[in-house]
């Protein structure tokens, strides 16, 4: 007789291996049915379209979880160096279609839903965007997660699970109105709450100095509960984790100092603690020094570092003890990437843990911290740099302020030794800024506490070394690197533009999807008539589809044969939507002046959100809508010119508009846009670019050849010269008749007859304090736009230029960006090796 199984042997039956999902249509239908009835508890008589979306989402999720568990088991067994990407924003968008693409499930799901009498595209439209970001910085983090999984890195994204993401934008009477984005209202099928990993985060209190060292006591505690979202790589069976923290009040919150009748109030006050993860701050490239925002920044850092250290200590490898207690190996096992200065408190927090709790000597703790952390800078705009008032940090994080002071003292000692007698340099480089309000410069903290500092495009990284971080570069030149941004070709080509992905695959195969440099092979098809025809046909289909979408959603009719001229990005003075407006009015005035002349028809679309407190950005939106009201209702113009403001621009709208674009507007003042990533998405999707030599535009023009790019305007050096000379808008107003006419129209109320002075703030800014020199580039911009129209009249030549752009966009894959971070900052090697599938033996 066989002996009875031990408990451990019995438990071996609990394995993911026996549960591997079969990825065929019959099984998918069966699972869809099971989830509709058993998970959602609905039958077909009462199921809504949203129920069908959820059933499909859960069905697809089933194919993720086996791989997810397997991947995490693999990391535990092999103990690779872990990469921790810390960001206050992850602008994910929708997850369903991206998951199907990366798991190669799309065709089977399409067929299964079709057989069930459902339309998969309609179901995909039901999903809410996860709008946990403002713009480029948050979307970059999402693209990076996709690439890290695709390159087999043991990577984790850490951030905040905001209950309300970026606001929904409604246009009412031409003005932006904000509505709360209640994206979790119906639940989120992609996240898994992990209450068992809840961690305490401390605020306020005071510091006690004991014989054992400093102790942070009498603190208020807020709990951080993690929610995990799977991040699948492209067809390699790797599924990484994005862990977002949600704030919860502890059970004894406000009850310790219980007073009679205070119980109900204490329970109601739990909201105050939980407000930490309530809402994303809607500022892009602007610092707002609010206490709640500082709490958010520390909250994500404190919870994440506890998690990182727990995982480091409980690893299978590295020492004979059941847990690691020695931190010498920490930088060999952990890399922390700071996405801008928002998570910069990771540096003093890691020091606090190592010195106060793990009892390391300061020098050793500092060595570990610097080797572990790296910092990415995203902007040179002074108003965007984080400078926290000392009094705020002192109240909220008293121990961290002491640590920052100590870091500063030791850092300035090094500076003084390297540059004896240079007192002004000490002032410039200090982490502490003296003034009416004493502040901590978080960028300086990040540079001092990191082993690598990078900009996000070549020109931006050079500007950092020559200007805002010049002193730091002179002290430690080895720290400074460039990592030009990229985008994931899975979402931004295969998923959003399947027609184009298909005609490319027909010529060069599918390998380019995980190796975008292969697009170069398309250069041999620049004169291939059938390829030219196919590319043009896909673009026309995308334009028709987007026209139908605009008609259905916004009741606006546009001419699909017109040139689609598109500028979509956050509304900000430096991005110069106003320059675009001046060109539109120029075109309008020219049509009115010579109504019988032939004009290349254009549909100009501008979209983007303005920060709720940014008056000028909101006025810019009002101007765009006012221009549209005049232009679109003028019978003389007809369909030769249309101006559309795209309401509520977000990831899911970008996926529709970018594949339909003919012309991409990337027109920031040279030296202001760190990189840009929208520019790359347009290039990959077959639009031509009109742009300044700024950010990644410089490298895009270099890759494609300047002759395949519409470049105009001042270079960085020209802007500097103009600054030295003094920019005088009046000179341009006096010299350029068309420009003068436009400004006079704006001043006289031509575009706002009911409120003639509506745009006086815009005119006043443009004429008297325009930091971004719109007039200086006006003439060249208009001339460059004339070249665009001339080329558009020759469809074959236009499409050949499009093909050259697509073929040279390979550099701008986030896979390339992440491979460079991996090798040059994190010290790990990317791989395209497949992980075994859940049903395969390891």
Swiss-Prot record:
Binding site for AMP: 43, 76, 310-319
InterPro entries according to UniProt: Glycg_phsphrylas (IPR011833), Glyco_trans_35 (IPR000811), Pyridoxal_P_attach_site (IPR035090)
GO BP: glycogen catabolic process
Catalytic activity, as annotated: [(1->4)-alpha-D-glucosyl](n) + phosphate = [(1->4)-alpha-D-glucosyl](n-1) + alpha-D-glucose 1-phosphate
Keyword Glycoprotein: no
Changes after translation: Phosphorylation of Ser-15 converts phosphorylase B (unphosphorylated) to phosphorylase A.
One GO location term (cellular component): cytoplasm
Swiss-Prot/TrEMBL site (Involved in the association of subunits) positions: 109, 143
Modified residues (N-acetylserine): 2
Required cofactor(s): pyridoxal 5'-phosphate
Enzyme kind, highest EC tier: transferase
Ways its activity is controlled: Allosterically regulated through the non-covalent binding of metabolites, being activated by AMP and inhibited by ATP, ADP, and glucose-6-phosphate. The activity is also controlled by post-translational modifications including phosphorylation.
CDD domains with a match to the protein in the record: GT35_Glycogen_Phosphorylase
Entries under Gene3D superfamilies matching the protein: Glycogen Phosphorylase B
EC number of the protein: 2.4.1.1
GO MF terms held by the record: glycogen phosphorylase activity; pyridoxal phosphate binding
Residues modified as N6-(pyridoxal phosphate)lysine: 681
Site (May be involved in allosteric control): residue numbering on this chain: 156
Membrane-spanning residues: none
Pfam families in the record: Phosphorylase (PF00343)
Modified residues (Phosphoserine): 15, 430, 747-748
Record's subunit section: Homodimer. Homotetramer; to form the enzymatically active phosphorylase A.
Family under the similarity heading: Belongs to the glycogen phosphorylase family.
Function (record text): Allosteric enzyme that catalyzes the rate-limiting step in glycogen catabolism, the phosphorolytic cleavage of glycogen to produce glucose-1-phosphate, and plays a central role in maintaining cellular and organismal glucose homeostasis.
NCBIfam families, sorted: P_ylase
The name this protein goes by in its record: Glycogen phosphorylase, muscle form
């Amino acid at each position: 007789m066989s002996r009875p199984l031990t408990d451990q042997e019995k438990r071996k039956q609990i394995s993911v291996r026996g549960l591997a999902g079969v990825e065929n249509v019959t099984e998918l239908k069966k699972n869809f049915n099971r989830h509709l009835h058993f998970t959602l508890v609905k039958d077909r008589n009462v199921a809504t379209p949203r129920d069908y979306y959820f059933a499909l989402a859960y069905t697809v999720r089933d194919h993720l979880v086996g791989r997810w568990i397997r991947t995490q088991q693999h990391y535990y067994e092999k103990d690779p160096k872990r990469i921790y990407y810390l960001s206050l924003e992850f602008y994910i968008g929708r997850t369903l279609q991206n998951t199907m693409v990366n798991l190669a499930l799309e065709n089977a799901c399409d067929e299964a839903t079709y057989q069930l009498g459902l339309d998969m595209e309609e179901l995909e439209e039901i999903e809410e965007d996860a709008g946990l970001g403002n713009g480029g910085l948050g979307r970059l983090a999402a693209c990076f997660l996709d690439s890290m999984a695709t390159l087999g890195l043991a990577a984790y994204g850490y951030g905040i699970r905001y209950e309300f993401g970026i606001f929904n934008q409604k246009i009412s009477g031409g003005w932006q109105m904000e509505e709360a984005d209640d994206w979790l209202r119906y639940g989120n099928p992609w996240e898994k709450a992990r209450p068992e990993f809840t961690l305490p985060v401390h605020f306020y209190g005071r510091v006690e100095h004991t014989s054992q060292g400093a102790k942070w006591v009498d603190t208020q505690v807020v709990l951080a509960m993690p929610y995990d979202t799977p991040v699948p790589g492209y067809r390699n069976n790797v599924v990484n984790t994005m862990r977002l923290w949600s704030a919860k009040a502890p059970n004894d919150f406000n009850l310790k100092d219980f007073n009679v009748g205070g119980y109900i109030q204490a329970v109601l006050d739990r909201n105050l603690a939980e407000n930490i993860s309530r809402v994303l701050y809607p500022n892009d490239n602007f610092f707002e020094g609010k206490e709640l925002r500082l709490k958010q920044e520390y909250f994500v850092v404190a919870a994440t570092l506890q998690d990182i250290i727990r995982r480091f200590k409980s690893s299978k490898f590295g020492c004979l003890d059941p847990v690691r207690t020695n931190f010498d190996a920490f930088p060999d096992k952990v890399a922390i990437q700071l996405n801008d200065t928002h998570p910069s408190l990771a540096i003093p927090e890691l020091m606090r843990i190592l010195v106060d709790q793990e009892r390391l000597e300061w020098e050793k703790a500092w060595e570990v911290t610097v080797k572990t952390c790296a910092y990415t800078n995203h902007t040179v705009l002074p108003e965007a740099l984080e400078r926290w008032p000392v009094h705020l940090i002192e109240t909220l994080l008293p121990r961290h302020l002491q640590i920052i002071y100590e870091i500063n003292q030791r850092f300035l000692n090094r500076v003084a030794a390297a540059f004896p007698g240079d007192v002004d340099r000490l002032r410039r480089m200090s982490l502490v800024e003296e003034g009416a309000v004493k502040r901590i410069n978080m960028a300086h903290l990040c540079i001092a506490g990191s082993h690598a500092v990078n900009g996000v495009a070549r020109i931006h990284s050079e500007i950092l070394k020559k200007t805002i971080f010049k002193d730091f570069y002179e002290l430690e030149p080895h720290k400074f690197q460039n990592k030009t941004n990229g985008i994931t070709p899975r979402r931004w080509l295969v998923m959003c533009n399947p027609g184009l992905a298909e005609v490319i695959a027909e010529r060069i195969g599918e390998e380019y999807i995980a190796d975008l440099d292969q697009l170069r092979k398309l250069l041999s098809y620049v004169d291939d008539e059938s390829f030219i025809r196919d590319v043009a046909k896909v673009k026309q289909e995308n334009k028709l589809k987007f026209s139908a979408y605009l008609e259905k959603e916004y009741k606006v009719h546009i001419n699909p044969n017109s040139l689609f001229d598109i500028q979509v990005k956050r509304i900000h003075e430096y991005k110069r939507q106003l320059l675009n407006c001046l060109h539109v009015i120029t075109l309008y005035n020219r049509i009115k002046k010579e109504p019988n002349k032939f004009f290349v028809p254009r549909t100009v679309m501008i979209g983007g959100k303005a920060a709720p407190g940014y008056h000028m950005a909101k006025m810019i939106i009002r101007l765009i809508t006012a221009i549209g009201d005049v232009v679109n209702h003028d019978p003389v113009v007809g369909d030769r010119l249309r101006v559309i403001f795209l309401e509520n621009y977000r990831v899911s709208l970008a996926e529709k508009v970018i594949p339909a674009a003919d012309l991409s507007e990337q027109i920031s003042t040279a030296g202001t846009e760190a990189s840009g990533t929208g520019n790359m998405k347009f290039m990959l999707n077959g639009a031509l670019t009109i742009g300044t030599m700024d950010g990644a535009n410089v490298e895009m023009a270099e890759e494609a050849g300047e002759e395949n790019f519409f470049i105009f305007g001042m270079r960085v050096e020209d802007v500097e010269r103009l600054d030295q000379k003094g920019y005088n808008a009046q000179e341009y107003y006096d010299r350029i008749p068309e420009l003068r006419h436009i400004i006079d129209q704006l001043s006289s109320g031509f575009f706002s007859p009911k409120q003639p002075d509506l745009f006086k703030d815009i005119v006043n800014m443009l004429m008297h304090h325009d930091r971004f020199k719109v007039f200086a580039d006006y003439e060249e911009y208009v001339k460059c736009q004339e070249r665009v129209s001339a080329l558009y009249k020759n469809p074959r030549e236009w499409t050949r230029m499009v093909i050259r752009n697509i073929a040279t966009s390979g550099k701008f894959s986030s896979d390339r960006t992440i491979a460079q971070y991996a090798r040059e900052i994190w010290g790990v090697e990317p791989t395209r090796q497949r992980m075994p599938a859940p049903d395969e033996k390891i």
